[in-house]
């Protein structure tokens, strides 16, 4: 029983149309994964039969199908190229026509696995043709190349080699390419005409100077040695001009060549061996009949111009190479051995031949082989002509099949509309992707625009808000704000835009309060720390850091008052500035049963070099609440090396200079905590604190000592600094010794 409807696949595709036994049957429209690609037409038990397939790029196929592949006959439109003909299991062939809609270049013949193979005819945009054998998309075997009149032939300037018949033709965007060309003038860019290869007067340069012997030239060319020439030599100047102009021709292509996208099949590295060519009449044509290898004239063959210039003999890569005979329009001949279009031994015009008997024998054999190859090539061209006519018939049938496929596609759209009126037909799958892509771009914009606002607004923590937690890299302490029960006094209103603050917090365990100390440092070029972004309800994150130069990690702990807070979503800014990593670990003192926060220092405990602090002692309480929130590790990047920001200990100025980079050219402003008073009664409120400012002092940030126990670790860590200095000095001495031994 046949029915129909709409079915959406998990991969984003959909089918709307008729089906039978759970398979597409009848007429319907199906889109590929994520809406890419679309087939509209007739179906038979889950497989396409006749219809139109459209790719997201706009390429289309109209024709018959079998077992999910293009099979039978159909028309493919791909860029500027259109293929009409037979298809076999998804590939072009056996007979078909591929044509460029822009300039009329085309191939008509047999195909195999999607490439020209067998016999066929290639027509170029200027009207020139090749008829003969093909193998793997290239001319190979025997064939005939016929050019158009010289005045109409395509001008070729590029030294690259491609053709509409080769594998590389897929990237030409429908441009017709012209092989079989050679440079016409050695002192100019690699200018040539499509189908013209013969070069007359190959000995014109040789006869100018005896010093420029052919054997010497061929030897130097083969060994790729530098030739010493006089700067005043005409040949030297012309060679330089040729090299310069060839480079210019590489980068600047004429509009004619650009429109045709035609290239030549010569190796232009040896363009200097080519010689000056006489002016060719605009009506002159050239024909090559013979062997081909790898899309080039190679083997034996005959090339002849309509003005009487003719060459019979051996070829290699579109050049005369081997034994052959050259006949000039005036009837004179030149025969012997050629290398890269240059006669290196044999009989020249008006010259006494050398070793005439042996050379003449080899030349005669080469000429006979060339004539035989020409005869075979003409036979192959006739076979190619018959294959061409058969391919044209298949192309006509493909046009008829394409029209039927379009009609089936129209019926399929009507059927899909009946089963699902809300179904929207799209020409290709691009529309299916665009909404999601645009949405993702908008999300990125929102995140990127919101980030600078948080960076430019460092504020003290207020209840119910998320602290910025951005502190300068060179600050001795990190910010670990606990959740206060009341709002602390606001920060001074007189600070500048470039001021940065760091907070230092101590917790009063019993009173559920905390004491915050605000440190201000001027200069806006600090590398800033940030909290990682957490979801609501996540435990508080604790930053962590590793000591410089492999020093042991000192532990210290903080705790909150039970408030869960999200962090500042700025984890990436720090990482981009420096490769330093930090790690914090939690630690509990063995001698203290309480797991509270860090204690404040006594005013007479240590004399700080950079900050002046005056604090009054806190009242000790009997009990301490348990730490209920696990600490999370945070990894961030430092600015110049490993810095132990989590170490609450004092450092000497000399150690700070070695381990900490200067924060900025501006001097930091030091704030002194004048007084800190606690009430006698335990109250659940924030401890009162005041801030007073002292004049700026030229100093570097230092770290505070929180526990007496870390004093022992301080000694061990500070003792490693001289060792590092000694190691660096020894390393420098070793490098200097190596430098002296090897380079002096």
Curated annotation (Swiss-Prot):
According to its UniProt entry, one GO biological process term is:
neuromuscular process controlling balance
What did gene disruption experiments reveal? Mice are viable and fertile, but have defects in balance/motor coordination tasks. Jph3 and Jph4 double knockout mice exhibit atypical depolarizing responses, irregular cerebellar plasticity due to abolished crosstalk in Purkinje cells. There is hyperphosphorylation of PRKCG and mild impairment of synaptic maturation. Exploratory activity, hippocampal plasticity and memory are impaired and there is abnormal foot-clasping reflex.
Q: Which residues carry this modification: Phosphoserine?
A: 440, 457, 475, 506, 699, 706
The record gives the membrane topology as:
Peripheral membrane protein; Single-pass type IV membrane protein
Cite the entry's keywords alphabetically: Cell membrane, Endoplasmic reticulum, Membrane, Phosphoprotein, Repeat, Transmembrane, Transmembrane helix
- Principal place where this protein is found? membrane
Which sequence positions carry the modification called Phosphothreonine?
451, 471
> Any stretches that span the bilayer, and where are they?
724-744
Tissue note: Specifically expressed in brain. Highest levels in the olfactory tubercle, caudate putamen, nucleus accumbens, hippocampal formation, piriform cortex and cerebellar cortex. Expressed in disctete neurons sites. In hippocampal formation, expressed in dendrites of hippocampal pyramidal and denate granule cells. In cerebellum, it is highly expressed in Purkinge cells, while it is weakly expressed in granular cells.
List residue spans for each MORN repeat. Answer: 15-37, 39-60, 61-82, 83-105, 107-129, 130-152, 288-310, 311-333
Q: Which Pfam families match?
A: MORN
- Region of interest (Disordered), residue spans: 230-252, 451-603, 624-677
The residue ranges flagged as biased composition, category Low complexity, are 231-244
Look up keyword Transmembrane and say if it applies. yes
Which stretches are Cytoplasmic in the membrane topology? Answer: 1-723
Q: Which Gene3D superfamilies match?
A: Histone H3 K4-specific methyltransferase SET7/9 N-terminal domain
Q: Name one GO cellular component term.
A: membrane
Which locations, inside or outside the cell, does it occupy? Answer: Cell membrane; Endoplasmic reticulum membrane
What is the role of this chain? Junctophilins contribute to the formation of junctional membrane complexes (JMCs) which link the plasma membrane with the endoplasmic or sarcoplasmic reticulum in excitable cells. Provides a structural foundation for functional cross-talk between the cell surface and intracellular calcium release channels. JPH3 is brain-specific and appears to have an active role in certain neurons involved in motor coordination and memory.
Can you quote the domain comment?
The MORN (membrane occupation and recognition nexus) repeats contribute to the plasma membrane binding, possibly by interacting with phospholipids.
Protein family membership = Belongs to the junctophilin family.
Name of protein: Junctophilin-3
- Give the classification, highest ranks: Eukaryota, Metazoa, Chordata, Craniata, Vertebrata
User: Source gene?
Assistant: Jph3
